[in-house]
Each structure stands twice: as structure tokens, then as C-alpha cells.
Regions:
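Membrane-embedded beta-barrel scaffold of Gram-negative outer-membrane proteins
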Residues: 452, 459-464, 468, 491-551, ...
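Short acidic/polar hinge/loop motifs at secondary-structure boundaries
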Residues: 100-127
């Protein structure tokens, strides 16, 4: 607020500065989150989302800006998605929002559904994970950081429309009152017909012939997707007894038609899935709790997730949309079932600053899960007699020493414990199931250090003996296309990172270069395998494969020129190899013919590059025109192990795609208009074998932003 001062007069003004804090393993530092991540001892990067908020990108798209990160989607909007980080993908990489684990929240609230405006930044920790997250990731952690700084009032709203009848909208509004009461509401939706063209074999129902090598240009016809979500929070901030006390409620809904199986040759015409999730939550934080230097963060949430799978069609479909009667109902497996999942999660983080140089952090995470399945096919609902349950406890303690800004060091230990209960067949050939349960526990440990060799030249070294407990899907399946194994064992890995980065500003010029090498020696590696089912159908299952050795490196660079140019990119090379010398079968131990060969179905070389141009005060002071070009390259890789041959029919080909975006913002960002063309050279794109993504697509977006 401006202060009027008469000539010769004096006035006393009290100012209160509210710092942004993160209670992980780091000392609480008054700085931006991006700079805090860069100076930490861990192999981590922070992606600032502000430059992307005028685009139609979602959070998963933004993550591709991080070195070593690869996004793998099975199709269009709402399709199944995996994030790959330094050779690890899917369940190896854990997702958090503001430090809270997102296990069990359901697909309606996935990263590929959440608009990029939802987050201030995205933190990516690679391989070695700080104790403060309390997780069992061996691949890394993705932490979505939202804005928590109290704001007097604000409104951010956007709508976009594009190819394949795609609609996306987003509203974020909130207010903080003088008495400390604050509220915030996030709401968003996505809709798409996903009716893009693909090249696929077509079954001839008259002759019954099916030639997989003969492809036709066909249009997807059973792939409509929509989801809606509302996240509401209210509470108090800046009180003597609480820095932040918030109560929240999240509701999300999803409807998804299922066009293909695990390969594109399998096509469905009526199969679909729908679901919803309800999640109340609580968050409490207090600095200097009872004594100076002791900080506390508590979070808790409960998630009720209901998913209904419908596969009751009496017809078989081909890629032209033609249908043929089936002998028995069900395109994949005759089902009309509902899975109700209950997921409880609680976290406790204590951060104690012993002195200016030393910090202790304790973290504990409790997660419980229960799923009940009910068949709706019969006139009366039939509930499975054996529920599927897990209970997971992870505790961690770390010590951090930071005697100067030039170097710091952290050492930590973790304890993992998991209880699992669920159905298992009485014998290998039996259709009768009994309840089984087991408990596993493990100890992990690690250390991380960083040192500034010269101003702007930073070295990092980190190591962790890490464990990953099996996920719900790996133990129990997804109740549809995937089956699990309740007896699957935890993975363990020796993870080592070495990084070197350099940054320099020379007048209007700025450069940033970073390179890193990774080493992962993983045992009991959990692998997703495709298996043939009866009737020519296919599904997926999970197994403990054995030992896998990962070696690789990433390189990233960025150049800036004043306020009008930014250009940079990333290159990743990962060598993920089968490291199991023998394999155990019914006849005993035999030589593993795949020893030292590449692990199949894993991209191992990829890169991206972008150029951003800005024209400030174009047309009027405060207006900005920006033009962005970016591309993505992925080298070809094999769907099957190289040890069983190099059949070109099972190769995901080389790909090089290009995108272009134009954005014009007025009145210092209050109003924004943007146009995008994705894949403007109309390349055939695949992230997974035979599952083709969309070709050239156009999108437009309008956005308004008011308030602080």
C-alpha cells in the first residue's frame, strides 16, 4: 500500500515477508524453489511451468522438459501413460503433489489429465530420493508444487478447443482475508473423441482372414474420453499456532472408451470404463513448534475410488467398425464389474535445525489400501469373498551439514515394511482361491553431497541402496487387461549419480550446461510381460525378472539472450541390460540366452530441443508476443529381446516430431490467446509398439488472469 509523506515528515512502516518453505531434507531457505533444487546435493531439476501456462499442455507434457524424462502414451487424450526416467518407467517413478504421495487416486486425476496451470513448478528427483518424501521409488520422484503463498484474491480461467473435437477448460480462484481465512478452488475438464486416423490390419469377417502385415488407413471409433475434477481447499494461514491449516476435498470423474488391447491389432467396439473418486484431505504446518528450529508438517487423506469395467458386447469388431456376432458375449473377457478401492494415506515430517549448519529430518508415511470386486452380471450383485489389501509403512531419518554456501552433505537411512493379503489359487491348475498374507521389510540408506568447484561450477555425487515395494497393480492387476501376482517380491537397487553443471551470465547473455552419469544395479526387477490368452486375445502380467544393469548419461544446455530469446535442449542415452546369467525353469537352472542384451520395450536414446522468441510491448506496453518451436526425437527400439532375433515387425521405428506455438498476451498477462500445431509434419508416432498416436493436430486457447 502506498504511504503519503509530507515534506520533512517521518513515518514508521512495519513490513512482513512471508518466505516459501519446503520441509524435506533441506534447510529451510528463503529462495525460489527452482534455485533451491539446483543448489541441493541431490540429482534433481525443477521445471518452471509459468512459460507453459498459455499453452494447451498438461503436466505430463511439461515433464518432457526435464533431462532423462520420456513420456510414453498409448494414444490420445486420456490414454494410458507411463513416465520413464533414466531408463526406469511406470511404477519405478513415484508422483507427489506438494510432497503428498498420489498412490491410489485413480486415473481420473492423472498427470496427463491435469492442466499445466495447476502447478507453479515440477520437481524431478532422479534415482536417489530425499527422506522427506517417504517413498520406495528406485527410479525417482516427481513432485508437483502448487502455489501456497497467500494471495489477496485471484482468478485464472482458460478454455481450449482443437482437433478430434478436443475441449479443455480450467478455472482456479481463491482469496485470503485479513483474519487469515483462505480458500482456493481448482476445477478442470477434458473431452476428446480421439477419432484420429491410424494404420492397422483389418479382419475380413466374410473369409475370416487377418493379415497383420497388410495395413489400412482407418479411423478410431471407440475412443471417446472425458474427465472432470474439482479440488477445493479452505483453512487458516499465518496464525500463532499454525502457519497453515487447510482442509480439502477432491472429486473427479472419468469415462473412457477402450479402442484397443495391449496391441493395435486387437480392436474393441463397445468396451468401456467409468469411474469416480472422492478424497477429503488435511494439511497442517508449523515452524518453530514449541522450540526454535523445530518444524512440523502433517498431511492426511482418504481416497474412495470406484471403477466400473463394462465388456458385455455380443459382437466382434474390426478396424472399419464392422461387426460380427460372437459365440459368447465379451470382446476381451465377459465382465460387468465394479472395483471399490479405499486408500488411506498419512505423512509426518519433523525438521530440526540444530544450528545454522546442521539439520535433522524425520519422516514417516503410512499407506493402507483395500479393494473389493463386485460382479454386476447376475440379477443379484456377487461380491468376491476375498478382498485385496496392503499396508505400507516407510520411515526415514536424515542428517544434513551445510557449513557454507559452497558445499553441503546429507546422509540418510530408511525402513520399509509392507503387509499384503489377497487371493491365491490353491494349485497352479485350480480355479479355487484361498486367502494368503505375508509381510516383508527392508532397510535402505544413502548419502548425497555437492561442492562448488568455482563460482557457477557445481559438482554433485549421490548414492542410495533403494527398495521399491510392489504396487497394487503388480500384485492384484487392474481387474481388466492386466493380472497381478500377490507373491511378487520387492525390487532393490544400488543407485549412483554424478553430475556437473555450469552457469554463467555475461551482460544480456546467459548459458547453462549440465551433464550427468547414472548407474543402477537392480535385483528382482519387476517386468510387465505380454501374454497370449484364449481366442487370440492378449493381456499383461508382472514377474520378477531378475537382475538389470543400467548405465547412461544425460546432457542438457540452455542459452538466453536478454528478454527475447531462450533456446535449449536435452539428450539422453541409457544402456539398460539384462544382467541375469542363469534362469530358473522347471528343469532347473539354465544359461540365460538374453544375458547382456538390452531390456526390451525400453527407449534408450532420445532428445528434445526448443526455441522461444519474445517481442515485448508489441502493440502496447505490457503486451508480449511469443513464438515457440520444439521437437522430440526417439531412436528405434525393439519390442522383444534382441536375444530372440531382430524381427523388424517388432521394432518401434525412429521418430522425429515437430511442434509450433504462437501466443499473444495483453495487459501484462491479463488476457492471452494462443494457437498451436502439434506434429506439424504429420509423422507416424509411437511410444509403445503398434499403438499409434495422433498425426497433425491444431489447437487454440484463450486465458484470463486477474488479481495478485
Amino acid at each position: 500500500m502506498p504511504v503519503k509523506l509530507a515534506a520533512g515528515g517521518r513515518v514508521k512502516q512495519n513490513l512482513t515477508i512471508t518466505p516459501e518453505t519446503q520441509l524435506l531434507d533441506e534447510v529451510t531457505i528463503v529462495s525460489t524453489g527452482v534455485s533451491r533444487i539446483k543448489r541441493s546435493a541431490f540429482n534433481a531439476v525443477a521445471v518452471d511451468t509459468k512459460e507453459l501456462q498459455n499453452t494447451t499442455k498438461n503436466l505430463s507434457d511439461a515433464l518432457t522438459k526435464a533431462p532423462g524424462m520420456k513420456l510414453r502414451e498409448a494414444g490420445g487424450v486420456g490414454s494410458d501413460m507411463q513416465l520413464m526416467l533414466d531408463g526406469f518407467s511406470g511404477k519405478h517413478v513415484k508422483v507427489f503433489i506438494d510432497g503428498v504421495p498420489q498412490e491410489g487416486v485413480g486415473s481420473s486425476f492423472g498427470l496427463n489429465n491435469i492442466p499445466v496451470s495447476f502447478a507453479d513448478r515440477i520437481e524431478v528427483y532422479k534415482g536417489v530420493v530425499p527422506v522427506g518424501f517417504g517413498t520406495d521409488a528406485i527410479g525417482g520422484v516427481i513432485n508437483i508444487v502448487t502455489g501456497k503463498k497467500p494471495r489477496r484474491w485471484f482468478l485464472d480461467a482458460s478454455y481450449s478447443y482443437g482437433s478430434f473435437n478436443t475441449h479443455k477448460s480450467y478455472v482456479n480462484l481463491g482469496q485470503t482475508f485479513k483474519n487469515g481465512f483462505t480458500y482456493e478452488i481448482n476445477a478442470f475438464q477434458n473431452y476428446s473423441d480421439n477419432d484420429y486416423h491410424v494404420d492397422a490390419p483389418v479382419k475380413n469377417f466374410e473369409t475370416g482372414s487377418f493379415n497383420e502385415s497388410e495395413k489400412y488407413r482407418v479411423k478410431r471409433f471407440n475412443d471417446t474420453y472425458h474427465n472432470e475434477a474439482v479440488v477445493a481447499k479452505a483453512g487458516l494461514v499465518d496464525k500463532s499456532w499454525a502457519d497453515r491449516l487447510m482442509f480439502g476435498f477432491t472429486y473427479s470423474h472419468m469415462y473412457k472408451e477402450i479402442q484397443t488391447g495391449v496391441r493395435q491389432k486387437t480392436v474393441f467396439g463397445e468396451k468401456h470404463r467409468r469411474g469416480h473418486a472422492l478424497m477429503p484431505s488435511m494439511e497442517y504446518s508449523k515452524r518453530n513448534l514449541m522450540t526454535k528450529g523445530l518444524d512440523l508438517v502433517l498431511t492426511a487423506n482418504y481416497n474412495r475410488n470406484a471403477t466400473t469395467n463394462v465388456d458385455t458386447a455380443r459382437y466382434e469388431y474390426n478396424w472399419r467398425g464392422e461387426k460380427h456376432p460372437l459365440n459368447s458375449p465379451g470382446e476381451q473377457s465377459h465382465q460387468y464389474s465394479r472395483a471399490n478401492s479405499d486408500n488411506w494415506n498419512g505423512t509426518l515430517t519433523l525438521n530440526y535445525r540444530i544450528d545454522k549448519a546442521q539439520t535433522l529430518t524425520f519422516n514417516h508415511v503410512l499407506n493402507t489400501f483395500r479393494r473389493d470386486n463386485t460382479s454386476l452380471l447376475a440379477a443379484q450383485e456377487q461380491k468376491d469373498p476375498i478382498a485385496k489389501e496392503t499396508r505400507k509403512n516407510i520411515s526415514g531419518l536424515s542428517y544434513r551439514l551445510m557449513p557454507s554456501e559452497r558445499w553441503n552433505f546429507s546422509a540418510f537411512g530408511k525402513y520399509y515394511r509392507q503387509y499384503v493379503a489377497g487371493p491365491i489359487a490353491e494349485t497352479e491348475t485350480s480355479s479355487n482361491f484361498i486367502r494368503t498374507s505375508r509381510t516383508v521389510d527392508s532397510w535402505g540408506y544413502g548419502a548425497a553431497g555437492t561442492y562448488f568447484l568455482l563460482p557457477g561450477l557445481q559438482a554433485k555425487l549421490s548414492y542410495e541402496k533403494a527398495y521399491r515395494l510392489p504396487t497394487i497393480e503388480e500384485m492384484f492387476g487392474d481387474e481388466d487387461l492386466e493380472s497381478g501376482d500377490v507373491g511378487i517380491r520387492p525390487e532393490n537397487s544400488d543407485n549412483l549419480n554424478l553430475n556437473l553443471s555450469y552457469s554463467k551470465a555475461l551482460g544480456k547473455h546467459s548459458i547453462y550446461v549440465e551433464g550427468g552419469v547414472v548407474y543402477r544395479n537392480t535385483k528382482d526387477y519387476i517386468q510387465r510381460n505380454i501374454q497370449d490368452l484364449s481366442g487370440g486375445k492378449e493381456g499383461a502380467t508382472y514377474i520378477n525378472y531378475g537382475k538389470v544393469l543400467t548405465k547412461g548419461y544425460t546432457v542438457s544446455a540452455r542459452y538466453g539472450l536478454g528478454r527475447w530469446l531462450s533456446a535449449g535442449g536435452n539428450f539422453t542415452q541409457m544402456n539398460v541390460r539384462d544382467n541375469e546369467k542363469t534362469q530358473i525353469g522347471t528343469g532347473g537352472a539354465t544359461e540365460n540366452i538374453g544375458y547382456k542384451s538390452r531390456v526390451p520395450n525400453v527407449p534408450y536414446r532420445f532428445a528434445d530441443f526448443d526455441v522461444n522468441l519474445y517481442w515485448h510491448d508489441l502493440g502496447k506496453k505490457g503486451n508480449v508476443l511469443s513464438v515457440t518451436y520444439d521437437n522430440q526425437y526417439m531412436h528405434s527400439f525393439s519390442y522383444y529381446s534382441q536375444a530372440v532375433g531382430k524381427n523388424s515387425d517388432f521394432i518401434v521405428p525412429d521418430q522425429f516430431s515437430h511442434n509450433l506455438a504462437l501466443s499473444y498476451s495483453l495487459n501484462r498477462g491479463r488476457y492471452s490467446f494462443s494457437l498451436e500445431c502439434r506434429n506439424f509434419t504429420d509423422e507416424d508416432l509411437y511410444d509403445n509398439f503398434s499403438l499409434q498416436k495422433a498425426g497433425r493436430a491444431f489447437y487454440g486457447k484463450v486465458r484470463i488472469h486477474f488479481g495478485d
